[in-house]
């Protein structure tokens, strides 16, 4: 019931697992049997569907690894990119990179094979790492929204220091590690007998108490509220107030108008990141909630395929974020180009910003120093 993982195999009935394992015409012993009813066939066992799933997962992995690695690289390499907001964005990229490397390959393997082939240790570690990475992403997006809200709406002159930002990032990982710990603790690596003399290996959740323990449902619902509903509420409130503030704010002077445009672009970029995350994860969260409320959802003919499709949609957020940074933010776009050209300084591609303009800008800023200074600086990424 964690945020990601192939739960379809863990909740199937014996009859469903039989159909998946042996296909339409043979038993484990190679005996011919009558064709099963069409509605019992699992679509994820069809070669055409498997090819599509492999292409989809591999594309997401490739785009996610390249994009998120590039975000991390430019923040580390270029000193001008080492701002508090960019540290949070880089932390988001680290979490997404972990999802690309720890979630997708194992989930795809589990989906295609129909049983757990990675051993007992990874049975406990993989779901934990998956939950940890997703929760860090959610908390980081919330932190970014609160940081922008603090600086822009309240005009606070005291900015968060880099040391404090690292402390916040550490807390995000610590809280996520604690919240994801049940995914590693309440796990069972076991053999399940499908028919006499035939068993498969399964990696399933094992909560204390009776077979259908309420603890699993409570954990799943709590995760939905704490790591999806509540963050989305906070993020939506923060960005609504930011949008209202930017809409009503008027900056004097040409230089401040330039910064006002940058503020708007930055806010749009961050809002798009949040919207992409929310929309991409909504189908999977809603589907898992439906399973918790009504277990008959597990009896759907295409439960496994539906789960896999929603999982793919959720994973698209891991490569969408770097695309948003590159497309909507000029700083990242220039940093990406500079990284591809193997340039050592980001300033080398700031050709449109002349020394004369910089001097003029500094002079205007000094003349217009006042309450708006903190407002201007706070919105630059």
From Swiss-Prot:
Record topological domains on the Extracellular side: 1-51, 108-124, 187-216, 290-304
Keywords: Cell membrane, Disulfide bond, G-protein coupled receptor, Glycoprotein, Lipoprotein, Membrane, Palmitate, Receptor, Transducer, Transmembrane, Transmembrane helix
Example of a GO cellular component annotation carried by this entry: glutamatergic synapse
Residues carrying a glycan: 11
Membership in a protein family: Belongs to the G-protein coupled receptor 1 family.
PANTHER family for the chain: NEUROPEPTIDE Y RECEPTOR, NEUROPEPTIDE Y RECEPTOR TYPE 2
GO biological process: adenylate cyclase-inhibiting G protein-coupled receptor signaling pathway; behavioral fear response; cardiac left ventricle morphogenesis; locomotory behavior; negative regulation of cAMP/PKA signal transduction; negative regulation of excitatory postsynaptic potential; negative regulation of feeding behavior; negative regulation of nervous system process
Protein's gene: NPY2R
Protein name as annotated: Neuropeptide Y receptor type 2
Region annotation Disordered: where it falls in the sequence: 1-35
Protein's UniProt keywords contain Chaperone: no
């Amino acid at each position: 019931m964690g945020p990601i993982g192939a739960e379809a195999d863990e909740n199937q009935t014996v009859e469903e697992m039989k159909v998946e394992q042996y296909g339409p015409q043979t038993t484990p012993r190679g005996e011919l049997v009558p064709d099963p009813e069409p509605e019992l066939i699992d679509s994820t066992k069809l070669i055409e569907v498997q090819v599509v799933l492999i292409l989809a997962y591999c594309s997401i992995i490739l785009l996610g690894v390249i994009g998120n690695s590039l975000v991390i690289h430019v923040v580390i390499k270029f000193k001008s990119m080492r701002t508090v907001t960019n540290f949070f964005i880089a932390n988001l990229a680290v979490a997404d990179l972990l999802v690309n490397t720890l979630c997708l390959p194992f989930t795809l393997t589990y989906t295609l094979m129909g049983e757990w082939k990675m051993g007992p240790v990874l049975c406990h570690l993989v779901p934990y790492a998956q939950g940890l990475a997703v929760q860090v992403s959610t908390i980081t997006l919330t932190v970014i929204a609160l940081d922008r809200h603090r600086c822009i709406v309240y005009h606070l002159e005291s900015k968060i220091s880099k040391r404090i930002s690292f402390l916040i990032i550490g807390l995000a990982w610590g809280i996520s590690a604690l919240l994801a710990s049940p995914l590693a603790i309440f796990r069972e690596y076991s053999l399940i007998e499908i028919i006499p003399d035939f068993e498969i290996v399964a990696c399933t959740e094992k909560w204390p108490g009776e077979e259908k323990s309420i603890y699993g449902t409570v954990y799943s619902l709590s995760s939905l509220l704490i790591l999806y509903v509540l963050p989305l509420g906070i993020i939506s409130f923060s960005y609504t107030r930011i949008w209202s503030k930017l809409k009503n704010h008027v900056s004097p002077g040409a230089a401040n108008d330039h910064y006002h445009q940058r503020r708007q672009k930055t806010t749009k970029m961050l809002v798009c990141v949040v919207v992409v995350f929310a929309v991409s994860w909504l189908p999977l969260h809603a589907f898992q909630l439906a399973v918790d409320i009504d277990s008959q959802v597990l009896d759907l003919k295409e439960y496994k395929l539906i789960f896999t499709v929603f999982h793919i949609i959720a994973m698209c957020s891991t490569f969408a974020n770097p695309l948003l940074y590159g497309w909507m933010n000029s700083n990242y776009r220039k940093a990406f180009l500079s990284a591809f050209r193997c340039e050592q300084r980001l300033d080398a591609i700031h050709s449109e910003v002349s020394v004369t303009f910089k001097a003029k800008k500094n002079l205007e800023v000094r003349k217009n120093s006042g309450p708006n200074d903190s407002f201007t600086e706070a919105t630059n990424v």
